[in-house]
């Protein structure tokens, strides 16, 4: 079983190595600030969101398309921490 410490390291690396620079900055900035504070359920949500394609995620962040219900809570948490514009 993966330890919390290993999981956090894996998520941090994954956050900074996305498919697009925009998503690197969004996810990377968020995990640098808040990753240690997330509980197991929030980490699950973050991991599920990060499993989506960047081309789908970016429009959710910018409000160009509707966010799937499964990702709303974690996306709102990230948006509360990151200023896009």
Regions found by a protein language model. Name each.
Residues 2-85:
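Positively charged, polar, low-complexity stretches
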């Amino acid at each position: 079983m993966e330890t919390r410490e290993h999981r956090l390291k894996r998520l941090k690396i994954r956050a900074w190595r996305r498919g697009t620079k925009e998503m690197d900055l969004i996810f990377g900035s968020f995990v640098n600030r808040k990753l240690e504070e997330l509980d197991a359920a929030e980490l699950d949500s973050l991991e599920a969101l990060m499993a989506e394609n960047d081309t789908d995620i970016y429009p959710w962040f910018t409000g160009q398309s509707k966010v799937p219900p499964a990702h709303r809570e974690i996306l709102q948490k990230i948006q509360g921490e990151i200023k896009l514009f």
